[in-house]
């Protein structure tokens, strides 16, 4: 008894011991796991800077392009367009600045300031003043059939530099829309006497339509386009009005809409003018400071005014007017034409100098049209990396190229243009009877093939008729007709497959010669009846199973059954035979 009790105690103690060991292992395992995975959790919680940038950049790009695309898709009225901040706001992170598409403002008023608790006034004059600009904006931006999925094109990069490039293009595009929408033709906020190439604010801030430019990514992009024409034409470089506009007090459009720039490389002008640059001549304020009097100076610019102050400060290291230098900068050989500060006295054949004076009339007809109009953007010659290495944001280092393979707007423009062009071509073809639609083309091809088939079938029928006619003539010449020939065929021994009824699936099953096993097939009626009774007796089937069927049908059924047995026996499909072959 004591031994039994001791055994029970040992078992209970052992069980308790193993339970304790089990729980202790679980506890230590949890502690080890927490200690071991601590660094991983820490790494997971504090992502790498590049990973954070990727997530942030995706959200930012989607947000910015959502706003941009929503601008183009929204149906808006003229008054909403002119004075509503939701179309003029550049802050792309403002999620509340855009409302639903279905919400439309009252067309009888213009919203002046959304932040002033919907304070509205009648401003018909301001609305009408921007009418042409509104029409142009709708034409170029409101017909785009963009979808948010297209923004995924900008998220396929694998490094920070690619996203930065896309970011620059996005900012440039947003700024272009903003300046196009908010260009003011009045002179209230003019900064014509801002004598700084860096555009330091003259009166504290530089404004666009009563809005500060502090949230702009950079000043005065050469991508500012305003492709419209009207009484308030803001494009200063067309051949009809550029001289007058750049001579007026309000010439800030020469600065804001600086479409041409020396960084863009040579333009396709005629000989001796091929590298000509616009009046602003690589600087922003030259429309103010060069009074369009370049051609009135002497040849060597001895009486050059003190406008050198309007260049950047590093230009002041030279005495004003360059008069202390020998005429022609003889200190430099004339072959050194690439010196950035030599005066413009080289022969006219030296057209590659970036700062050559404008020695031809301002109404020269081929200045803009030869390169595609005032909105032409030639290829960029400065590397994109200079944009990120330029702390001063100098304008000649900040220009970004318009790469059609990465410019979402250009791609959408081309796609929409091709789509509309295909619609027009299809419509014209349908009107003219030319089938171009895919479905109609398939039908047309089918009709052609059917016509060809019918033609070939007709030829075949003709040949068959001719063959039949010749065969009948042959039979007549040989003294027998078709019936005699058929009877002779039936009397002959046949090795063909026997088909029963209209169901010819047995033709693929019974390959043996059935005539050798059923000699009664072509026998007389008495023998046929005897054979039928024999089959019935051998298979133990009574005629009551077929009370209504004829003897012919009865023979048909029995013969099929017997054929199946014979076929199974010859081909080894009998279950017993198959079993024996498999196991023995």
Swiss-Prot record:
Coiled-coil ranges (or none): 267-319, 436-477
Residue ranges, compositional bias (Polar residues): 184-194, 204-225
Region ranges (Disordered): 184-226
Protein name: Uncharacterized protein PFA0635c
Transmembrane segments: 15-35
Membrane topology type: Single-pass membrane protein
Key words, A-Z: Coiled coil, Membrane, Merozoite, Transmembrane, Transmembrane helix
UniProt keyword annotation of Acyltransferase present: no
GO CC terms in record: membrane
Subcellular compartments: Membrane
Biotechnological applications listed in the UniProt record: Possible candidate for an effective malaria vaccine as determined by epitope response in sera.
């Amino acid at each position: 008894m004591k031994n039994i009790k001791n055994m029970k105690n040992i078992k209970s103690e052992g069980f308790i011991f193993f339970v304790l060991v089990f729980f202790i292992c679980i506890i230590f395992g949890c502690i080890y796991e927490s200690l071991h995975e601590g660094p991983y959790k820490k790494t997971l919680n504090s992502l790498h800077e590049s990973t954070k940038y990727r997530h942030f950049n995706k959200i930012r790009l989607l947000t910015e392009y959502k706003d941009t695309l929503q601008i183009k898709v929204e149906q808006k009225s003229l008054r909403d367009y002119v004075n509503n901040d939701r179309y003029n706001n550049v802050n792309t992170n403002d999620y509340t600045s855009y409302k639903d598409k279905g919400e439309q403002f009252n067309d009888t008023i213009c919203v002046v300031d959304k932040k002033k608790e919907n304070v509205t006034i009648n401003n018909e004059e301001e609305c009408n003043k921007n009418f042409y600009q509104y029409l142009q904006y709708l034409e170029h931006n409101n017909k785009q059939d963009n979808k948010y999925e297209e923004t995924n094109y900008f998220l396929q990069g694998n490094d920070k530099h690619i996203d930065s490039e896309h970011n620059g293009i996005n900012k440039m595009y947003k700024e272009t829309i903003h300046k196009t929408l908010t260009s003011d033709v009045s002179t209230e906020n003019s900064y014509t006497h801002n004598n700084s190439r860096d555009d330091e604010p003259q009166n504290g801030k530089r404004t666009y339509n009563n809005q500060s430019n502090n949230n702009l990514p950079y000043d005065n992009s050469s991508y500012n386009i305003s492709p419209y024409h009207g009484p308030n034409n803001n494009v200063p470089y067309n051949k009809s009005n550029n001289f007058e506009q750049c001579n007026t007090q309000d010439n800030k459009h020469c600065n804001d809409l600086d479409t041409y720039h020396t960084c863009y490389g040579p333009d396709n002008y005629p000989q001796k003018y091929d590298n000509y640059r616009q009046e602003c001549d690589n600087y922003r304020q030259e429309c103010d400071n060069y009074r369009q009097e370049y051609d009135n100076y002497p040849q060597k610019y001895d009486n050059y005014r003190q406008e050198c102050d309007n260049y950047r400060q590093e230009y002041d290291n030279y005495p004003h007017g360059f008069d202390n230098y020998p005429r022609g900068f003889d200190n430099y050989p004339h072959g050194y034409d690439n010196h950035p500060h030599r005066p413009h006295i080289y022969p006219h054949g030296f057209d590659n100098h970036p700062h050559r004076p404008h020695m031809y009339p301002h109404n020269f007809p081929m200045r803009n049209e030869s390169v595609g109009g005032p909105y032409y953007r030639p290829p960029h010659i400065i590397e994109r990396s200079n944009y990120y290495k330029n702390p001063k944001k100098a304008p000649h280092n900040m220009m970004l190229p318009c790469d059609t393979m990465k410019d979402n707007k250009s791609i959408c423009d081309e796609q929409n243009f091709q789509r509309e062009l295909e619609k027009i071509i299809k419509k014209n073809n349908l009107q003219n009877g030319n089938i171009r639609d895919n479905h109609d083309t398939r039908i047309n091809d089918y009709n052609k093939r059917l016509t060809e088939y019918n033609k070939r079938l007709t030829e075949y029928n003709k040949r068959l008729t001719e063959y039949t006619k010749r065969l009948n003539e042959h039979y007549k010449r040989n003294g027998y007709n078709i019936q005699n020939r058929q009877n002779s065929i039936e009397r002959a021994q046949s090795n063909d497959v026997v088909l029963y009824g209209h169901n010819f699936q047995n033709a693929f099953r019974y390959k043996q010669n059935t005539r050798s096993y059923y000699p009664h097939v072509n026998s007389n009626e008495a023998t046929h009846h005897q054979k039928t009774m024999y089959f019935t007796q051998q298979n133990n089937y009574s005629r009551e199973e077929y009370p209504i069927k004829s003897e012919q049908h009865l023979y048909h059924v029995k013969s099929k059954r017997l054929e199946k047995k014979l076929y199974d026996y010859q081909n080894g499909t009998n279950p017993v035979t198959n079993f024996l072959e498999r196991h023995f």
